[in-house]
Amino acid sequence: MKIQQIRNATIRIECAGKHFLIDPWFQKKGTGMSAPSPDPEKAKTPSPTTELPFPVEQIMEGIDAMIVTHIHPDHFDPETAAMLDKSIPVFAVNEETKSQIEGFGYTSVMVLKDEGTDFDGVVLIRTEAMHGESPDQAAGPVCGIILQAAEEPVLYVAGDTVYYKGVERALEQYRPDVVVLNARGAELMGLGRLIMGAEDVLNVCEAAPNATIIASHMDAVNHATVTRAELRDFLRKHGKDGHVLIPEDGECLEFSGM
């Protein structure tokens, strides 16, 4: 299995010979949204705050399917949707998102299922996620995903979520070998924290002591509250720096089969 950090929450996954792209967001630096951060200076800064590490054509080379955990401007936006081959299979969190993606012109859109979908030997399982600190404040429908395949590590991509009972259930049920966390700790005016921050990552370390944890969704949007450097420092102080990998954009990690 290979996991390549592209930018933000966009990652490439190679599993059992299949190549998946999660949450493609290909806008150029400074041409997207300026999210309403509580920090007035950050609120003025347009996202993305970094460029892609590679050309879009290189990122998309060999991709067999895309997975969209939710429709937000920093996960799958209309500009990115217009760039890509509309015949590529796409897995969506729910029927509403499926319809939105079909509205972009995509012709092979499927809904992820809690019971799993077999995609050429790789089973994709939808998991719970909560995109905010409470159900009332959650920023729309979102999911995580489990990838399972013969002789491969079990991978859990938690998606845009805080640490809560739903994440605990996924960790307990699937016992993943590798866990990808969106860990920038973003905040929006009036909504509070949207995804995991440093303390949440520490909670996952304690809940999944035998898993390799990867921190993604870092250093690319204006409303982030945790940087890679800050997360590394926090984990070092808590003795967990050897438990969590924090890849730079473009970096590829490889894991042996189980």
Residue ranges and their predicted role:
Residues 31, 47, 53-118:
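Active-site HxH/HxHxD metal-binding segment of metal-dependent hydrolases
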Residues 5-16, 118-177, 196:
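Catalytic core of the metallo-beta-lactamase
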Residues 27-29, 72-76, 98-100, 115-118, ...:
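Active-site environment of divalent metal-dependent phosphoester hydrolases
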Residues 162-249:
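Cap/insert and terminal regions of metallo-dependent hydrolase folds
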Residues 18-67, 78-83, 134, 163-173:
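Pre-active-site segment of Zn-dependent metallo-hydrolases
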Residues 1, 85-90, 153-155:
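Short active-site oxyanion
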Residues 59, 92-152, 233-258:
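Metallo-beta-lactamase
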Residues 22-23, 62-71, 91-94, 155-161, ...:
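Active-site neighborhood of phospho(di)ester-bond hydrolases with catalytic His/Asp-centered motifs
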